[in-house]
Every structure is written in C-alpha cells, then in structure tokens.
Swiss-Prot record:
This is UDP-N-acetylglucosamine transporter YEA4. Pfam families: UAA. Signal peptide: none annotated. InterPro entries: SCL35B1-4/HUT1 (IPR013657). It is a multi-pass membrane protein.
Amino acid sequence: MWNSLKAFALVFGGCCSNVITFETLMSNETGSINNLITFCQFLFVTCQGLPEFLDVHQPFPYFKPLKTPLHVYVITVVLFYISSTTNNNVFKYNISIPIHIVFRCFGTVITMFTCWLLNGRKYTKIQILSTLFLTIGAIIASLFKDADFRYQDLKLQAWKIGSDQSVDLTFIFGICILVLSSFTSSLLSAYNERTYQKYGKHWKENIFYSHFLSLPLFLFSRKQLIHEYRVMRKSERILCSNFGGKILVPREETLLLFNVLTQYFCVKGVNILASKTNALTLSITLLVRKFISLLLSVRLFDNNLSYTGYIGVYLVFFGAFIYSLGSIHPRQNDKGAIKKSK
C-alpha cells in the first residue's frame, strides 16, 4: 500500500514538475535543446543506478547477474528510446502543445487495444466506458482550452481546410512522429506488463537497463547534441543567492538540472506503478496527471481555461472516478490472462 502511494506521489509530483521545467526550456530564445534534454535524463538515471547494479568488490568490476533476460531488455530499449526521442523532438515540426496532448490522450485507447491484442487481457464495460470518457474529455479540454466551442467556428475551420491548396509537409511529418510515439509508448506499457508477469516485478532493474542500454544510440545524434550544448551555453545568466552572497548561474543549465531531477522521480514513480498495477491503470493515471499539469499551467502562467475546456476536465476526472469504481471488484479475466501469457 505504501509503495503504491509513493508511486502516485512520484508520478504526480515528479512528472508535473518535469512538464513545467520542460515547457520553460521549450520557450527559450536560444533554440531547441530537445535531444540534449533527453540525453541528460538518460545519463542521470544511469549514473544514479550504476552503484546498485555494478559489483566493485572484485578485482575487475562487473555487472550483477540479471533477473530478467537481456534479450527482453533489448526490445524494451528499442521501444523506450523511440518513444522518448520522438516525444521530445516532435515540437520541431510545427506541433503545438494542444495537438501534442490530444494525440497523447489516445494512448489510453491504444494501450487498451495492445494489451487485448498482445496479452489477451479482457476489460469490463465500465473500464471501456471510462476510457472513452477520459479520451473525449482530454480532446475537448485540449482543443478548446482558450475558447469555447462554437459551431460557426467549426464550419469556418472546415472551409479553410477544404479551400487551402497548400500542404504543410512539416506538420504532416510531425503528426506521423506523434502517431509513432503514441504506439511505441503503448507497446512498451503492454510489453512491460507481460515482462513483470513472467519474470517478476524488478522495476529498478528495468529502469537502469532501459536507460543504460539506450545511451549508445545517442551516438547517431552526437553532432546535434554538441550543437545543442553550445546553444545552451549561450543562455543568459540569472542571479541566485547562496551562503556567501549572490552568484550568476546559467539559466538554461539550471532549468536542465531541475528537469533531469524531476524526470528521475517521474520515471521511478511510473515504473513502481507499472509493477503494482496493469498497463491500462498506468495509462489512465498518466492521463489524469497530464490534466493536473494542464490545470497547473492555467494557474501558474495565468492562462485562461474556457467553459468548454472545464467540461473536458470534468469528463476526465469523471472517467477516472468510474474506472476506479470498476477496478474495485476482483478481475477474474486478469488472472486468466496471466496464465495465458505464461
């Protein structure tokens, strides 16, 4: 029980804080540093977990025996790397934050489908209904965050799309990346669920090796990483107080440090939760977390949320509520699915 509460605290605290620091870094005037952010997040998690999985008491240091086979982590690494890098780099292709949220909201539906297809999991009518409420609410709140829904505006937008002959290929490419990111993220959730069922819930090992084995893949983007590091070094200095007075520190590097720390807590919470629950519960928890972040953004950055947007938020929380009610009863289908996967 305590581990579950700890996981929820890490997810909602760490992930929400991480989104705030990430969006602040995204709004910098020096340029995009998305690849550098992702690399630093992976490197920090690897360094933090290294002492636990590296045995240094022998003449030659070596990694402790794996509890989960290496070939399982190879698939995890591929899915995790693709999901993380595409998710952080999609903003380069004319994708706005609302569009990003809308597509990521479909992750819950995709997760339900992949778990049904790959793991043989069956869901109750209440769970399916709650997922629909969550997804529809997420889309409404994202699309109508700033302005209320009006039928005339919808007709005008449809007319513009129909009459516009030019095609924004950059935007289309960005949408394709978003679709890829959503599918790989859902596949990763379903794959982790099966891994935990078959080999045990070794979430710490999963965190370490999914990040550690992903680091060599960043060699393919090493030139971009060097460029982004130089861009970050050009950021303005801000005045910070310390015990001896005040010092000037790089603004971007300070934000990056907080982003990396909060990402670690976020990843830790997500993996603990993944080991305690199923993939759909995890997906719904992350969806609700996104809307906590949305409400924090409205509050902290003086952004307005329309009445239509609030309707979407209410639908999200209502969907989460009825899903929790549907999850109280024992899941006989889940037990059958576990036996089937073995």
